[in-house]
Each structure stands twice: as C-alpha cells, then as structure tokens.
Curated annotation (Swiss-Prot):
The lineage of its organism: Eukaryota, Metazoa, Chordata, Craniata, Vertebrata. It comes from Pongo abelii (Sumatran orangutan). Pfam families: Epimerase. Its cofactor is FAD. This is NADH dehydrogenase [ubiquinone] 1 alpha subcomplex subunit 9, mitochondrial. Binds 1 FAD per subunit. Keywords: Acetylation, Electron transport, FAD, Flavoprotein, Mitochondrion, Respiratory chain, Transit peptide, Transport.
Amino acid sequence: MAAAAQSRVVRVLSMSRSAITAIATSVCHGPPRRQLHHALIPHGKGGRSSVSGIVATVFGATGFLGRYVVNHLGRMGSQVIIPYRCDTYDIMHLRPMGDLGQLLFLEWDARDKDSIRRVVQHSNVVINLIGRDWETRNFDFEDVFVKIPQAIAQLSKEAGVEKFIHVSHLNANIKSSSRYLRNKAVGEKVVRDAFPEAIIIKPSDIFGREDRFLNSFASMHRFGPTPLGSLGWKTVKQPVYVVDVSKGIVNAVKDPDANGKSFAFVGPNRYLLFHLVKYIFAVAHRLFLPFPLPLFAYRWVARVFEISPFEPWITRDKVERMHITDMKLPHLPGLEDLGIQATPLELKAIEVLRRHRTYRWLSAEIEDVKPAKTVNI
C-alpha cells in the first residue's frame, strides 16, 4: 500500500514538472517577429543623430542667445565647438543639446591668439556671439566688441573658415551717444575688413526667458514708481524674439547667398516705450506708476548701481540705449529673407513675465490683457 502511494506521488510530481514546463514555454514564447519592409521604415530628418556637415565654433555660447544657437545647430546634427572661460558647471545645460560626442568644450583665453586658433582650426563655420551689457576692469566695450571680434575674424580667415557670422546691434552707430553702440559699429567695420565675406547680424533688443529686456523692465516694480525719460513717449522699440534670431543665424549658415551681407533682425511690431512698459506691467499684473525722470538724473542713479559690488541692475550706458529709438533699415534683408516669420511680442511675453507675478495672478489668462498699442514711426 505504501508502494502504491509512493508511485502516485511520483506520478503527480512528474505531471507537475511537465505542466510547469508547458506553462513556462507558453509564457516565454513571444509573438513572431514582424517582418519589416524598407518602404515601411520612416524617412526624414535624422535630428540630433544625423550629420549636417557643419562643424561650428560658437563664441559666446554660454550666454543668452548662445544656448538657442547651439540647440538649433545640435538638433540638425552639427558638431559644435564651444569655447568657454566659465566654471564647468555653467556649461552643463548645453551638454544635452547635441548627440554623444557632437559638442566639444574647450577652454580659451580671449587675449591669446594661439587659444583662438586652436578652437577655430577644424571648423568650417565660426559664429561670434560675444557680448557684455556693462564694462568691467578686465574687459571694456572696446575689448568685447572690437579687439576680440577682430582677432577671431582674422584667425578664422587664416584657418580657411568658410562662413563667419558676427552678431552686432540694430542701432550700432559710430555717432551714437552710447559707448556700447559706438563700439558695436567699429566692430562691424573691423570684422568686415578682416573677413570680407562675413555675415553681420543686426538684431534689435532681444526678448526671451533669460533676457535683460523684458525682465529688466518688469523688475522695476520693486522700486515702486517706474522712471522713464520723457515718460517713454519719444522712444520707439521693435523687440525681436530670441528663437527667431537663433533660427535666422542657423539659416544664414545654410544659405549660400548670405555671404558678405548684413541682416537686420527685428520684430513685426513697433511700440512706444511707454506703451511697451505698460504692457509688460499688465502681463505681470503689477501696478504701473510711470514718472518722468530727466536723463541726467537717471544717469546719476545708474552710477550708484555701477559702483556697487554686485551685478548692476542698470548702468549709465544702458540708460542711453534704453532711450534710443530703434532704426528702420529697409535696405537690409531681414528674417523673412531667411525664411523666418517674426514672432509678435504678445505671443511670448507671458513665458518671460509669468515669474514676475504674485501667486494670486500666477495662472491668470493672458487674454485678459490688452495688446500693446503699436505705432508706425
């Protein structure tokens, strides 16, 4: 009897093993592989994993405009050399903008020609975005806008660079009251002399998430009333969106007919400074209390910020630039000639100004704010 019971146990165990094997086989056995036909494989741009043939050195890539230019170059499969002088942690945000090994970071010295030569010698495109809103003990406006661009242009020409793009300013003028804009004008001339085929980009004031244009005006609410020379009734501004500028620069790289030309990048609308600042405060849901401050008094206030040990909120030169009307340059090609439709300020202002709202108005609809009044002067 014991033997019979033992045989039944063995039989049950053997059946259990076979059942387990069958179940495991049925679970692990997946569906048959789908047979792909070449016609079914999606075609199109390869994105960051493609190869555009562009090897670009971008000076000033760690700045406001630079991050957008690097991103647009990276997303089309370009190899980008990024010279930097800052801490390595300040360039971390650029690393995901290109495929593995496509972004090369090299330390450089702006006053060392061998250092400049090293970062441009293997490139077919060089883009100069170097800029500074205020002068320091180490670099004044002449260094930043004249001497350094001249050296980069000369060494790029010697290295056989095919395209050189230099970013200036719409209001660059040798007779300007702004030292910033005077040196921008001289910089254009020395770059053109050193690299005759250079493409010069002349944008107006650029706005975007990290700008010093909309954010600067919006932060005035901390001081109570908003000082404006002549209340802003004598100044006209035509700001341009940072993404449009970066796309225009990249399209100029790809355009064989752009060599040797100057481009004026402006937004689609012109505004009186008063109406523009009023709109900025309306989007930020802040009380707008303008008061006329004579420019000589405004410069005196700016001088106080200049001598502080912190980053200056405003400088005397910025006061001048703030109250200079944006030029109209109809003889120069613009964004439209490079296939870019300029973005109105009203579509993107909320992206920049939402952080200036109080919690009560954080999610308020932008439709409740009237668009800024435009002018045609």
